[in-house]
């Protein structure tokens, strides 16, 4: 607190794990957001361990109360030579990555996918080598561009170890690098705080206050202890120092936070919050551009293929009622800018049939004469009284579902078709 004015400094929590950090986080995304808003936080980050699973719920909850949200993730980083499953020693540290923009979110997503596909469940550790020299196919993830990187030192910090880590960290992440300070009312908090302060000063790196939050209120501590015991596979009474010594890993009051952290470290949380501009609302369906031939726009190509299909479906002439339906549907599709979606499904179906893979659209797509003319469905909407708006409407706010069913005997083809389409090459 500012002693002169009595005004509490602003604060944003940038290290917060929900119950999507399995057997670590004790509170739901909704509980965390509600508590942060009640405490008057400027914003909050969701940083589950090697996961973005909690981000959608956190996004919805934060949006409902007008609380700025940063999407990120937490990783344990162990020395390159540390044996899996063994104590990594003082060289280990925590890493909080925060997406600054959509590109950063994409890079963070790729990093998480890479680790989850290449590590046993629950052991999604990184090493300095992985971050600095990822495989060639993932070379663009070096230093995880467009993400803030916060080094969370092992407690209690050692000057020699921290200096070496910060030299490497600064070289890799540059201006995006920050040094995290966690204060949880433990015996060596004072010494830890001084080591972090001195190391940051020597390296010229900004220090940021972190709560290392795993629960929204202190009374969740028994639940967190229970989850720790389950994770370790032993009774609570035998967990000893593996249990958190107190309930400080909750969203504390701003008065308490102001007492624990230097003003600069608190101000840094808000500067980082303001520099992160990504929202899940920025995500949209994206479709390949290659499906539209040169000289066409998605609108003109969809119209061309639809009318060509109509002439095949109705060789004796397209009935006026069908013509009107086609014009109505094409106009609505163009207005909603869904042409790439319809063309993507059309391209998949064309590819499947070129390989004699039996497939057919079903469900509410049968309400659409455009789908019928494109050959996606085989039910003539003219012969039914189905409601087109059940399939596509302005109010829905997202592309319709077009289920393309492949028969059980074509399992290999069913897998090969989308794989080939996504890769842009024919399957072997």
What are these regions (language model features)?
Residues 196-202, 341-358:
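Short, hydrophobic/aliphatic alpha-helical segments
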Residues 18, 44-50, 362-366:
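Ser/Thr-glycine-rich phosphate-binding loops at phosphate-binding pockets of nucleotides
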Residues 25, 29, 51-61, 162, ...:
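Active-site-adjacent beta->alpha loops and helix N-cap segments on the catalytic face
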């Amino acid at each position: 607190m500012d002693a002169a004015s009595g005004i509490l400094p602003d604060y944003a929590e940038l290290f917060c794990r929900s119950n999507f950090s399995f057997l670590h986080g004790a509170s739901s995304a909704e509980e965390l957001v509600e508590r942060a808003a009640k405490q008057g936080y400027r914003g909050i980050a969701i940083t589950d361990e090697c996961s973005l699973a909690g981000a959608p719920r956190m996004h919805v909850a934060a949006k409902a109360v007008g609380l700025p949200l940063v999407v990120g993730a937490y990783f344990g980083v162990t020395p390159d030579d540390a044996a899996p499953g063994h104590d990594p020693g003082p060289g280990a540290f925590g890493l909080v990555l925060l997406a600054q923009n959509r590109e950063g979110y994409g890079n963070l997503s790729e990093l998480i996918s890479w680790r989850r596909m290449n590590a046993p469940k629950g052991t999604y550790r990184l090493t300095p080598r992985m971050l600095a020299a990822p495989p060639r196919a993932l070379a663009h993830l070096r230093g995880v561009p467009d993400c803030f990187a916060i080094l969370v030192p092992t407690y209690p910090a050692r000057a020699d170890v921290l200096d070496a880590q910060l030299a490497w960290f600064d070289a890799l992440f540059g201006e995006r690098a920050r040094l995290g300070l966690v204060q949880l009312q433990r015996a060596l908090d004072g010494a830890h705080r001084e080591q972090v302060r001195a190391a940051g000063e020597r390296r010229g790196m900004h220090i940021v206050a972190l709560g290392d939050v795993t629960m929204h209120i202190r009374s969740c501590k028994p639940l967190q202890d229970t989850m720790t015991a389950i994770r370790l596979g032993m009774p609570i009474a035998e967990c000893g120092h593996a249990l958190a010594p107190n309930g400080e890993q909750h969203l504390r009051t701003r008065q308490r936070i102001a007492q624990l952290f230097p003003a600069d470290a608190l101000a840094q949380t808000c500067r980082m919050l303001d520099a992160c501009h990504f929202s899940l609302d920025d995500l949209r369906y994206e479709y390949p551009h290659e499906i539209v031939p040169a000289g066409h726009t998605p609108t003109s190509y969809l119209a061309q293929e639809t009318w060509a299909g109509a002439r095949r479906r109705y060789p004796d002439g397209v009935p006026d009622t069908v013509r009107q339906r086609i014009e109505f549907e094409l106009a609505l599709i163009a207005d909603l800018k869904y042409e790439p979606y319809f063309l993507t499904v059309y391209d998949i179906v064309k590819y499947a049939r070129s390989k004699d893979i039996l497939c057919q659209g079903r469900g509410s797509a049968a309400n659409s004469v455009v789908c019928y003319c494109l050959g996606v469905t085989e039910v003539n909407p003219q012969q039914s009284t189905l409601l087109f708006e059940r399939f596509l409407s302005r109010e829905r706010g997202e592309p319709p579902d077009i289920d393309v069913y492949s028969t059980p005997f074509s399992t290999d083809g069913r897998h090969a078709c989308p794989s080939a389409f996504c890769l842009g090459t024919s399957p072997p």
